């Protein structure tokens, strides 16, 4: 079974081909250094997992990545995508939801981000994010690429049997993530 962890960063998953675009990791199971906005050297893929990767591509590069993913997957293969939920972020910002904003600031930004706007913009720009994804946009693009059974899930809720292994408890990720699964 060919399982890919695309845009893995430091999240190396045993049993997966872990693909990132940074220095290799000595402790990796299998680690490839590939610019996924340009290359997609895989075929006959059973599982694609990408956690907080798609937002690091421009809109057009993200669409191309989704198309290439679809073409590389076997019929019946599954893809799970986690991205910051732009709609959720906009709502929390407009509602001045300090509990949400402070939880993110404490997990990822630090005390230099005291205001609602600084936290919101810190999420958008401080981590190399190039695109914001909401459910409607991601669902539309996945459908356009040919994916089926597109559904919104929760963190740690998946058709993947090993989801507790893939997504260990992480309050920051759980707080802000739009989780989507789809099939070829």
Which positions does each model-derived feature cover?
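Short amphipathic alpha-helical surface micro-motifs
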Residues: 1-2, 11-14, 114, 160-163
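Conserved SAM-binding loop
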Residues: 3-91, 180-184
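S-adenosyl-L-methionine-dependent methyltransferase catalytic module, highlighting the catalytic core
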Residues: 59-64, 68-74, 78-183
